[in-house]
A protein has these predicted regions:
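Short beta-strand elements that form the blades of beta-propeller/WD-repeat-like
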Residues: 1, 38-45, 97-102, 141-148
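A mid-sequence, solvent-exposed acidic-amphipathic segment
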Residues: 85-133
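Structural motif
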Residues: 1-5, 48-53, 105-112, 152-158
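C-terminal cell-surface anchoring/sorting signal
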Residues: 189-206
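Structural signature of eukaryotic scaffold interfaces centered on beta-propeller domains
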Residues: 23-38, 76-94, 130-140, 180-184
Length: 206
């Protein structure tokens, strides 16, 4: 496993660090986002892995595996977190909250910023699969997700309510694009979405 920076203009990839990071990722579907307060990358997986990556030298640190906290309605259930996003995702943020999407239970959760403790926010109300992406706008605080259909024929763009977890469909993404990773970025007078179709990608700092 290696960490790369991507030039937003040319698309050129540059490896961070001298080699593969360890511990390596474990799982088949992943959530990935920057913690804007400490400038570290959180990576979680459907195998309940919970890693912190250093974007400066490419090293990784294993922290507590994902689990539902005591007293939570889903305590004792096996999580399946495949989308992760932080609030207040902008330079100089003083506080942040990490959210995740569990595609096994079709719910929105919060995750402790230093540990793997999950707490249920609410039902998303959509039968999800693992081919999705999730991000929260640093400018507006609105949360969005893309979900690829089960037959891999289309992707739908959703807005996620962070207060109760409910999802509202904003429409099918045109051209039959299969969006597997996206980030919400501020643009003059509009909200822009950058996406990668057909292959896994990573988010950039906003």
């Amino acid at each position: 496993n290696n960490l790369y920076t991507i030039d937003a203009v040319t698309g050129a990839a540059t490896q961070v660090g001298s080699g593969p990071f360890a511990p390596a990722t474990n799982g088949s579907s992943f959530g990935f986002d920057f913690n804007p307060v400490i400038d570290r990358i959180r990576v979680v997986s459907d195998a309940n892995q919970n890693l912190v990556l250093n974007p400066n030298d490419g090293t990784s640190t294993q922290v507590t595996s994902l689990f539902f906290g005591a007293g939570d309605v889903n305590f004792g259930m096996d999580p399946n977190i495949v989308g992760s996003a932080y609030t207040n995702s902008y330079a100089g943020a003083m506080s942040t909250q990490l959210y995740g999407i569990d595609t096994g239970l079709d719910i929105l959760v919060t995750q402790a910023n230093s540990a793997g403790t999950l707490m249920t926010v609410g039902s998303i109300g959509v039968d999800l699969n693992d081919t999705l992406s999730f991000d929260i706008s640093g400018a507006s605080g609105f949360a969005y997700a893309t979900v690829v259909s089960d037959d891999f024929s289309s992707s739908t763009f959703w807005q996620i309510n962070l207060a109760d977890g409910s999802a509202t469909a904003l429409g099918e993404i045109g051209g039959g694009a299969l969006i597997t990773s996206m980030t919400v970025v501020p643009a003059p007078g509009a909200l822009a979405m950058l996406g990668l179709g057909g292959l896994a990608g990573s988010r950039r700092r906003r």
